[in-house]
Each structure stands twice: as C-alpha cells, then as structure tokens.
Amino acid sequence: MGIEEKIPGGFLLTTVEKAVGWVRKSSLWPATFGLACCAIEMMATGAGRYDLARFGMEVFRASPRQADLMIVAGRVSQKMAPVLRQIYDQMPEPKWVLAMGVCASSGGMFNNYAIVQGVDHVVPVDMYLPGCPPRPEMLMHAILELHEKIKSTKLGVHAVREAHEREEAAKHALPTHSMKGLLR
C-alpha cells in the first residue's frame, strides 16, 4: 500500500531528472556529419521504410546550433578533425555524439597518418555503433540505447562535472594504433 493508491487519478509521481530525461530522449535533433559509406545507411534510416520520426527525430539538422545529437558516419581525416570539433563546440548543451561505423569508432581499415584513429580523440563519444557500414536497423537500435542513456542523465552541477570528466578522458586516451595485442 503506497502513496500511489491514495492519490486521485491523473497524477504522476516522479523526479525532475526523470521527467527531463524522458522529454530529452523523446525529441533528439540529429546533426548530420556523413563522411563516407555509413552516411548512405544513415540517410536510409531517415527514409520512409525505417522512419526515425516515430522516435522524435523528424528531420536531420544542417545547423549545429539546432542539433543535440551528432552522428559521425564514416572516417574522419586529420584535416576534417578541427571542423568536427568546431561543429561539436557550436552545438548547445546537452549534446550527444554517436560514432557510426568502424571508421568513426577506431579508424577502421585505414590505419595511416591521414585518418583519425577513432573520433573519440576529437570529441567525447557517447555511443559506438560497429559495422562496415552498419545497417539502418543497427542505427535505430543504437539510438534507442542512447535514449536509455539520456533518460538517466544528471542535471545541474553533476552534469557539467560529468561532461568535463568525459572530455578530459577522451583527450588523454591512448590512440588505437598504439594499443598492442588487441586481436590476440
């Protein structure tokens, strides 16, 4: 016998953080940053067959100032990295980043000086999506997993501290090509 049974109908008991998390997850506005073949699959996800609109993502934003989710789809060159960081910095808080595909996550098969070995060395990444390229169903699953992460996001000072810690950890992370013995 809890308080829920004593309250008349039409009332909902929750915390402010949970209510804000529910609202934020229900209205993500993605910014496109399609650089390679993963961008084709990302565009297919927005088409009628998969219909991202049912998850509150009606339109991909061309302006970073109107977006709160950056989907980095494809490989990032060393010359493109500062542009990626500039677009990330222009996005309003709260913001999330999804690395789509092996190239965005770890540099993929392009282990050379011209390709960034993981976009997490440029911006903090909230969700990694493997695949070469990942199917639209996989992107939708990653977005739904990101929704769950967004629902549990902290507010206020705790959120700022958490974001700064994530960004500092990403800046000081060991490059993927320096890690030895990963496949053994």
UniProtKB/Swiss-Prot annotation:
The keyword Secreted does not apply. [4Fe-4S] cluster binds at residues 37-38, 103, 132. It is found in: Cell membrane. One of its GO terms (biological process) is electron transport coupled proton transport. Keywords: 4Fe-4S, Cell membrane, Iron, Iron-sulfur, Membrane, Metal-binding, NAD, Quinone, Translocase, Transport. One of its GO terms (molecular function) is quinone binding. The keyword Cell membrane applies. It comes from the Bacteria. NCBIfam families: nuoB_fam (TIGR01957), PRK06411.1 (NF005012). Belongs to the complex I 20 kDa subunit family. This is NADH-quinone oxidoreductase subunit B.
